[in-house]
Design a protein with these regions (language model features):
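A short, N-terminal "cap"/entry segment at the start of jelly-roll beta-barrel domains
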Residues: 1-50, 130-162
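Conserved short histidine dyad/triad with adjacent acidic residue
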Residues: 24-25, 35-70, 84-92, 99-103, ...
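Generic preference for hydrophobic/aromatic residues in regular secondary structure cores
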Residues: 53, 107, 114-115, 159-161
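Alpha/beta-hydrolase fold active-site loops
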Residues: 73
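Glycine-centered positions in the ABC transporter ATPase nucleotide-binding domain
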Residues: 80-81
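Ligand-binding loop in jelly-roll beta-barrel domains
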Residues: 89-90, 100-131
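C-terminal and inter-domain tail/linker signature
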Residues: 98-99, 142
Length: 162
Protein backbone atom coordinates (compact mmCIF):
# COMPACT_ATOMS: atom_id res chain seq x y z
CA UNK A 1 0.00 0.00 0.00
CA UNK A 2 0.95 3.65 -0.41
CA UNK A 3 2.43 5.82 2.29
CA UNK A 4 0.44 8.46 4.11
CA UNK A 5 1.22 10.83 6.98
CA UNK A 6 0.37 9.67 10.47
CA UNK A 7 -2.93 11.17 11.49
CA UNK A 8 -2.77 13.41 14.54
CA UNK A 9 1.02 13.21 14.79
CA UNK A 10 3.54 15.99 14.34
CA UNK A 11 3.18 19.70 13.87
CA UNK A 12 1.64 20.98 10.61
CA UNK A 13 3.79 24.14 10.85
CA UNK A 14 6.89 21.97 10.47
CA UNK A 15 5.67 20.08 7.42
CA UNK A 16 8.35 19.98 4.70
CA UNK A 17 6.82 20.56 1.28
CA UNK A 18 8.08 19.21 -2.02
CA UNK A 19 9.78 22.05 -3.90
CA UNK A 20 10.67 22.47 -7.56
CA UNK A 21 14.05 24.15 -7.14
CA UNK A 22 14.21 24.90 -10.89
CA UNK A 23 11.22 27.21 -10.41
CA UNK A 24 12.58 28.95 -7.31
CA UNK A 25 14.35 32.29 -7.71
CA UNK A 26 17.82 32.79 -6.32
CA UNK A 27 18.08 35.43 -3.64
CA UNK A 28 21.13 37.66 -3.54
CA UNK A 29 22.49 40.18 -1.08
CA UNK A 30 21.45 38.03 1.88
CA UNK A 31 24.21 39.66 3.92
CA UNK A 32 25.52 43.18 3.24
CA UNK A 33 29.16 42.01 3.51
CA UNK A 34 28.80 38.78 1.48
CA UNK A 35 30.93 38.98 -1.69
CA UNK A 36 28.88 39.31 -4.91
CA UNK A 37 28.49 36.40 -7.29
CA UNK A 38 26.39 33.95 -5.28
CA UNK A 39 22.70 33.15 -4.96
CA UNK A 40 20.72 31.21 -2.38
CA UNK A 41 17.50 29.20 -2.56
CA UNK A 42 15.94 28.58 0.86
CA UNK A 43 14.52 25.04 0.94
CA UNK A 44 13.20 25.00 4.49
CA UNK A 45 13.30 27.03 7.67
CA UNK A 46 11.91 25.42 10.79
CA UNK A 47 9.36 27.85 12.26
CA UNK A 48 10.19 26.78 15.81
CA UNK A 49 14.00 26.43 15.82
CA UNK A 50 14.93 28.58 12.78
CA UNK A 51 17.20 25.73 11.58
CA UNK A 52 17.54 26.25 7.83
CA UNK A 53 18.35 24.23 4.69
CA UNK A 54 19.30 25.91 1.41
CA UNK A 55 21.11 25.63 -1.90
CA UNK A 56 23.93 28.07 -2.63
CA UNK A 57 25.29 28.55 -6.14
CA UNK A 58 28.36 30.63 -6.95
CA UNK A 59 29.84 31.95 -10.17
CA UNK A 60 33.19 30.77 -11.58
CA UNK A 61 36.36 32.68 -10.65
CA UNK A 62 34.82 33.98 -7.42
CA UNK A 63 36.66 34.24 -4.13
CA UNK A 64 36.50 36.00 -0.79
CA UNK A 65 39.20 37.61 1.32
CA UNK A 66 37.79 37.17 4.84
CA UNK A 67 36.85 34.31 7.15
CA UNK A 68 33.33 33.69 8.47
CA UNK A 69 32.01 32.67 11.89
CA UNK A 70 28.47 31.44 12.67
CA UNK A 71 26.75 30.93 16.07
CA UNK A 72 25.17 27.68 14.82
CA UNK A 73 26.32 24.29 13.56
CA UNK A 74 26.82 24.33 9.79
CA UNK A 75 26.70 21.27 7.57
CA UNK A 76 27.53 21.19 3.84
CA UNK A 77 27.48 18.72 0.95
CA UNK A 78 29.11 19.86 -2.31
CA UNK A 79 26.83 18.91 -5.21
CA UNK A 80 28.88 20.29 -8.14
CA UNK A 81 32.02 22.29 -8.86
CA UNK A 82 34.98 22.77 -6.57
CA UNK A 83 35.88 24.92 -3.59
CA UNK A 84 39.34 26.13 -2.56
CA UNK A 85 39.44 26.95 1.13
CA UNK A 86 41.67 27.33 4.14
CA UNK A 87 41.83 23.54 4.61
CA UNK A 88 42.29 22.38 1.01
CA UNK A 89 40.22 21.79 -2.12
CA UNK A 90 36.76 20.20 -1.96
CA UNK A 91 35.24 18.43 -4.95
CA UNK A 92 31.73 17.05 -5.66
CA UNK A 93 30.72 14.74 -2.84
CA UNK A 94 32.74 16.64 -0.22
CA UNK A 95 31.01 16.99 3.14
CA UNK A 96 31.66 18.83 6.37
CA UNK A 97 29.98 19.29 9.73
CA UNK A 98 31.32 22.32 11.58
CA UNK A 99 30.56 23.27 15.19
CA UNK A 100 29.38 26.76 16.00
CA UNK A 101 31.88 29.64 16.38
CA UNK A 102 34.64 27.96 14.30
CA UNK A 103 36.24 30.49 11.90
CA UNK A 104 36.45 29.20 8.32
CA UNK A 105 37.53 30.48 4.95
CA UNK A 106 38.18 32.41 2.91
CA UNK A 107 36.90 30.34 0.00
CA UNK A 108 37.01 30.56 -3.77
CA UNK A 109 36.03 28.58 -6.86
CA UNK A 110 37.48 28.44 -10.35
CA UNK A 111 34.57 26.45 -11.81
CA UNK A 112 31.59 27.80 -9.88
CA UNK A 113 29.72 25.40 -7.62
CA UNK A 114 26.46 24.27 -6.07
CA UNK A 115 26.24 23.47 -2.35
CA UNK A 116 23.56 22.03 -0.08
CA UNK A 117 23.77 23.67 3.36
CA UNK A 118 21.98 23.02 6.62
CA UNK A 119 22.24 24.74 9.99
CA UNK A 120 21.27 23.53 13.44
CA UNK A 121 20.94 25.53 16.62
CA UNK A 122 18.91 28.55 15.60
CA UNK A 123 18.96 31.33 13.09
CA UNK A 124 22.06 31.69 10.90
CA UNK A 125 24.04 34.87 11.21
CA UNK A 126 27.53 35.60 9.92
CA UNK A 127 30.37 37.62 11.38
CA UNK A 128 33.29 38.36 9.07
CA UNK A 129 36.84 38.59 10.35
CA UNK A 130 40.38 38.69 9.01
CA UNK A 131 41.47 35.29 7.73
CA UNK A 132 44.15 33.36 9.63
CA UNK A 133 45.88 33.00 6.25
CA UNK A 134 45.19 34.75 2.94
CA UNK A 135 43.12 33.13 0.22
CA UNK A 136 45.08 31.21 -2.43
CA UNK A 137 44.26 28.76 -5.19
CA UNK A 138 45.25 25.11 -4.56
CA UNK A 139 45.94 25.37 -0.81
CA UNK A 140 47.68 22.54 1.02
CA UNK A 141 45.45 19.82 2.45
CA UNK A 142 44.81 20.53 6.14
CA UNK A 143 41.56 18.63 6.74
CA UNK A 144 40.33 18.03 10.29
CA UNK A 145 39.42 14.34 10.57
CA UNK A 146 38.01 12.22 13.40
CA UNK A 147 40.77 9.99 14.81
CA UNK A 148 39.30 6.81 13.29
CA UNK A 149 39.79 8.31 9.79
CA UNK A 150 43.33 9.65 10.17
CA UNK A 151 44.73 6.73 8.15
CA UNK A 152 42.81 8.05 5.11
CA UNK A 153 44.65 11.39 5.20
CA UNK A 154 46.55 12.33 2.06
CA UNK A 155 46.18 13.61 -1.46
CA UNK A 156 43.42 12.22 -3.64
CA UNK A 157 44.91 10.52 -6.71
CA UNK A 158 43.91 11.90 -10.09
CA UNK A 159 44.13 15.12 -11.99
CA UNK A 160 44.55 18.41 -10.22
CA UNK A 161 42.43 20.40 -12.65
CA UNK A 162 39.06 19.61 -14.22
Amino acid sequence: PGCSPLQGKGNEQRLVLQLDTFQMPYTGNFHPEFPPGAGRRILYQDPLTQDTSWLLGTLPMRWAERAEVHPVVEEMYLLAGEVHGDRGVMRPGAYFWRPEFVPHGPYGTQTGNLYFFRTQGGSLSTTYQDARRPFRWWPDDDVVLPSQYESARGAVPGTRRW
